[in-house]
């Protein structure tokens, strides 16, 4: 467990992720999050599984219809229009937290059970703390960080869960 001295160092990240990843990341209590209103303006992330299932056209059509609904609502109902925007659309936000919270959050959000979209964010934050901020000691204190490729770890976790259900 990191000591109180880690509370003296602060980080601020500007992030652009799908809304689902944002919802998971913003849940942490010891951070400040400011976000733009959810709109279709930043585009969306189409999961690879959609492509593998041959459903890219259907998915893209659904995203286009939701964007059209948003556009129809935004002038008269600006506060409610974001309800027409699916979680696959990206949202821009900033996150500010201290090093102690970074250790907790990045170790938790890099775990194999996590969704690949927020795992990628956690790993990139870890890299930026070490390399751009030059805080290698803080990055090295994250001893439970999982650095394996997010997609492969999630697949392996799903396989283990399936084996448990089948046995």
For each predicted feature, which ranges?
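A conserved ligand/cofactor-binding region detector
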Residues: 1-167
């Amino acid at each position: 467990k990191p000591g109180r001295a880690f509370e003296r160092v602060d980080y601020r990240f500007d992030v652009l992720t799908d809304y689902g990843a944002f919802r998971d990341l913003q849940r942490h209590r010891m951070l400040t999050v400011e976000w733009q209103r959810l709109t279709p303006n930043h585009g969306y992330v189409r999961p690879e599984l959609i492509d593998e299932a041959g459903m890219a056209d259907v998915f893209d059509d659904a995203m286009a219809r939701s964007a059209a609904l948003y556009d129809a609502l935004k002038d008269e109902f600006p506060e409610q229009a974001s309800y027409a925007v699916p979680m696959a659309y990206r949202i821009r936000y900033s996150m500010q937290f201290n090093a102690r919270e970074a250790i907790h959050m990045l170790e938790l959000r890099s775990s194999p059970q996590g969704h690949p979209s927020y795992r990628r964010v956690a790993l990139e934050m870890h890299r930026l703390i070490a390399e751009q901020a030059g805080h290698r000691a803080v990055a090295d204190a994250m001893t439970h960080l999982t650095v394996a490729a997010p997609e492969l770890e999630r697949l392996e976790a799903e396989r283990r869960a399936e084996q448990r259900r089948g046995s």
